[in-house]
């Protein structure tokens, strides 16, 4: 069943802009551990996007993009495929254990050892959170550089690569600290190998390398008893039930006025509101005033206010970080330290923190002089496309 495509991506990407500028003559591909990253990096007009399949470890794509390069298909089914090498892959420390000293709160000096086998559940998802995923991405990227003709045409080509530098198995940052240090150490070597290959095949003088990162932060964290000095638990299900009762008391009990909750956003029943010929702005405002009184709620912003321009510097992040066709009717910001408890045993409790994620953006290429600039950037796509 086809599950992935960029059709729900509302913005243009750098790859899209390159396709437009070259009138379709440039090749644009992306490689990433997961489908979302691959498709977001590729865009609508790309030639292809590839990610590692969680069931067999092969490089997968979507039928939205037409055709698979022959060398990708050969790699997937040949002697170099991941499945043919999996049993020999063992992750152990690359350096002596005393070299992993970046985190002072590490509690032990025990070495680690992880193996990967299709006999075990989550084999490939686990591998995708180890340094091996970056090496596999490099191996496929080298196929593109060797056989894809990158840099040999009159128009520039683009190969977008997403590496993984998070915690093993998605655990908390305080766990597997030796592992994440080893991941960074090996990633540095992987990037070096990629740049050396580009230099040999195309020449770094003929290449623009754009390096950036999204930052890494896991909101799930546990505190020893008695050390959490502020905060509490916010239960979205209880909040929705009380909000629906409140709106029923005002507008009638013949329907449910609340549709659902997702990612700190509440969605109202738009069809019921339209059928009842109610004013959406008024209803959103009443709901926001009600939610604002909940313990732990710092701010409630209505989707209508963001759409009509009735927003300020404090709520600008909601407007810039959401699309009006997907945005909830109410966007909730909790106070720092409060936990979001979805009342689902399968979901971890999320602790709300205000984190400033510093995002590096490095340009390297012929004619670019070394310099360091710190700036608050609103739009990066036009700048990258221009460069």
What are these regions (language model features)?
Residues 1-155, 164-171, 292-299, 341:
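His/Asp/Glu-rich, glycine-adjacent segments
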Residues 28-32, 158-162, 209-211, 331-333, ...:
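Structural recognition of the beta-strand scaffold that forms the well-ordered cores
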Residues 1-2, 42-44, 68-83, 95, ...:
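Secreted, luminal/periplasmic, and some membrane-associated catalytic domains
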Residues 2-5, 126-129, 180-181, 273-276, ...:
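Second-shell loop/turn segments in exported
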Residues 24-27, 154-158, 204-208, 326-328:
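Loop/turn elements at helix/coil->beta-strand transitions in domains of secreted/extracellular proteins
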Residues 326, 334-369:
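C-terminal, low-complexity/hydrophilic appendages and adjacent surface loops
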Residues 46, 158, 171-190, 197:
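Extended hydrophobic/aromatic segments used for targeting, binding, or gating
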Residues 377-383:
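Conserved small/polar residues in nucleotide/adenosyl-binding loops
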């Amino acid at each position: 069943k086809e599950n992935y495509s960029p059709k729900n991506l509302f913005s243009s990407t750098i790859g899209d802009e390159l396709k437009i500028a070259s009138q379709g003559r440039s090749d644009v591909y992306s490689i990433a551990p997961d489908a979302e990253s691959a498709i977001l990096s590729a865009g609508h007009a790309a030639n292809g996007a590839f990610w590692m399949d969680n069931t067999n470890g092969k490089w997968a794509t979507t039928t939205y993009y037409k055709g698979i390069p022959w060398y990708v298909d050969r790699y997937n089914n040949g002697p170099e495929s991941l499945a043919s090498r999996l049993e020999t892959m063992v992750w152990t420390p690359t350096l002596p254990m005393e070299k992993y000293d970046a985190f002072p709160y590490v509690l032990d000096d025990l070495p680690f050892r992880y193996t990967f086998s299709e006999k075990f559940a989550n084999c490939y998802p686990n591998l995708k959170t180890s340094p091996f995923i970056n090496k596999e991405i490099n191996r496929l990227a080298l196929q593109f550089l060797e056989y894809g003709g990158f840099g040999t045409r009159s128009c520039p080509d683009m190969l977008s690569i997403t590496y993984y530098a998070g915690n093993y198995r998605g655990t908390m940052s305080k766990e597997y600290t030796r592992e994440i240090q080893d991941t960074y150490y090996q990633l540095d070597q992987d990037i070096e190998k990629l740049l050396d290959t580009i230099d040999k095949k195309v020449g770094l003088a003929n290449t623009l390398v754009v390096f950036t990162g999204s930052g890494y932060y896991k909101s799930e964290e546990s505190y020893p008893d008695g050390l959490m000095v502020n905060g509490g638990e916010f239960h979205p299900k209880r909040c929705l039930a009380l909000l629906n009762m409140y709106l029923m008391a005002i507008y009638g009990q013949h329907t449910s006025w609340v549709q659902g909750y997702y990612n700190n956003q509440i969605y109202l029943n738009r069809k019921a509101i339209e059928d009842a010929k109610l004013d959406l702005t008024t209803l959103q405002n009443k709901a926001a005033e009600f939610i604002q009184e909940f313990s732990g709620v710092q701010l409630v912003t209505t989707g209508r206010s963001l759409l009509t321009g009735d927003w300020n510097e404090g709520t600008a992040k909601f407007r810039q970080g959401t699309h009006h066709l997907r945005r909830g009717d109410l966007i909730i910001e909790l106070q720092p330290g409060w936990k979001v408890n979805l009342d689902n045993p399968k979901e971890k409790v999320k602790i709300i923190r205000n984190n400033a994620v510093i995002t590096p953006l490095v340009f390297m290429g012929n004619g670019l002089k070394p310099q360091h600039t710190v700036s608050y950037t609103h739009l990066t796509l036009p700048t990258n496309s221009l460069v």
